[in-house]
């Protein structure tokens, strides 16, 4: 509950203690499109607590799509701060917008609060190790040109990679795009478990409900299972576990010498989870529980008590991502002729392999072709695709 200062930027040196912000932003898509780059590169001079006026500060125009996309980016920013001028028509409260936009805004604000265990741990790493929460990709891939070209893409802590949507929804397909560079390895869509092989750039598409957030293979993300408006430590922690590499994550709670560290070690080869607690356990809720969510698998969550222990994952059955279902949803919401939708879906769903699928989608117009290609790419296991 330490105090914080929000300050204007006063040149190098002024960044060491306060929260900064990117100035009085104009309410436009162009202004939003600059913010992810501005936020991630602030880390280059150690300005790790960098913020922006979510939704834009002044002027501009009323645009619910813009307001929602800015808020989604704000949830995956160092500081989540809605703000505007005193113009009564420029309010940023969720209930100022339509019921559906309001619902999505509230959903994302709750997501932000559920991320507090992860965010707090990452900010401890900033304080003690100088590691920013938001990092440009070239911090990890300094010798790859693609890392410098992906200006609006960044790492959000040690486990997640984010590529905010900064353009309006397409009126035909009701989704918006962003070009994403996937580094080597496997990446999973955090919300849907779609699998992306890291081998280059791909245009990805998301409806208003989603922002592109990707978990690296083996990612471990601790979250509050029952987020409230207070600052009490969670009664139950959700550990989101993504398959792949054997890795560990150390969750930090409390501060200074008066803190608890919970180390979670996941061994996918042996199907084991190791939970180790050190520090002043009296800081934690008396009935603390841990719930393990094994992404991409058809298995019930594993729930255990708050003591050091080893947990067996048991038999794991992969949860298939049905590309036909995704294609159907894509076509269902598109403003295209019914007969064309029906013919295209029939052809795609009866294709024998990805090569046949590519023959079907290659002649299509760009917007439709790219959307279908993403579905195929993130649903198939074929390394030749």
Give the label of every model feature segment.
Residues 1-210, 353, 372, 381-385:
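Catalytic-domain carbohydrate-binding cleft regions of carbohydrate-active enzymes
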Residues 160-161, 271-275, 309:
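Hydrophobic residues embedded in beta-strands of well-ordered beta-sheets
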Residues 180-192, 291-307:
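Solvent-exposed beta-hairpin/edge-strand motifs
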Residues 199-200, 208, 305-316:
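Solvent-exposed, conformationally flexible loop/turn segments
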Residues 211-303, 315-385:
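Accessory, solvent-exposed terminal regions and/or long lumenal/extracellular loops of proteins
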């Amino acid at each position: 509950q330490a105090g914080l200062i929000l300050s204007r930027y006063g040149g190098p040196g002024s960044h060491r203690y306060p929260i900064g912000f990117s100035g009085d932003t104009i309410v436009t898509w162009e202004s939003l499109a600059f913010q992810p780059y501005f936020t991630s590169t602030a880390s280059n001079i150690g300005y790790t607590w960098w913020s922006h006026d979510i939704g834009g500060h002044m002027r501009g125009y009323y645009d619910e799509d813009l307001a929602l996309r800015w808020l989604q980016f704000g949830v995956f920013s160092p500081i989540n701060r809605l703000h505007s001028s005193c113009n009564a028509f420029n309010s940023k409260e969720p209930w100022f917008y339509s019921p559906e936009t309001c619902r999505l805004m509230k959903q994302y604000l709750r997501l932000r609060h559920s991320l507090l265990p992860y965010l707090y741990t990452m900010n401890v790493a900033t304080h003690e190790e100088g590691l920013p929460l938001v990092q440009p990709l070239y911090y990890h891939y300094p010798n790859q040109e693609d890392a410098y070209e992906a200006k609006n893409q960044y790492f959000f802590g040690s486990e997640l990679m984010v590529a905010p949507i900064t353009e309006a929804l397409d009126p035909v397909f009701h989704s918006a795009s962003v070009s994403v560079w996937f580094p080597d390895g496997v990446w999973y869509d955090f919300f849907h478990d779609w699998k992306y092989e890291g081998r280059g750039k791909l245009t990805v598409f998301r409806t208003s409900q989603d922002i592109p957030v990707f978990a690296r293979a083996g990612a471990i993300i601790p979250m509050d299972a029952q987020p409230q408006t207070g600052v009490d430590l969670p009664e139950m922690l959700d550990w989101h576990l993504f398959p792949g590499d054997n890795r560990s994550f150390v969750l930090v709670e409390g501060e200074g010498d008066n803190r608890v560290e919970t180390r979670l070690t996941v061994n996918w080869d042996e199907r084991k989870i190791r939970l180790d607690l050190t520090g002043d356990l009296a800081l934690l809720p008396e009935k603390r529980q841990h719930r393990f969510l094994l992404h991409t698998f058809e298995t019930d969550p594993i729930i255990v008590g708050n003591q050091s222990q080893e947990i067996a994952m048991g038999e794991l059955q992969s949860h298939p991502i049905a590309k036909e279902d995704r294609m159907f949803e894509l076509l269902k919401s598109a403003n295209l002729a019914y007969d064309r939708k029906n013919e295209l879906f029939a052809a795609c769903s009866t294709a024998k392999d990805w090569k046949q699928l590519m023959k079907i989608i290659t002649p299509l117009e760009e917007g439709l072709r790219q959307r279908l290609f993403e579905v195929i790419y993130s649903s198939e296991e074929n390394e030749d695709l």
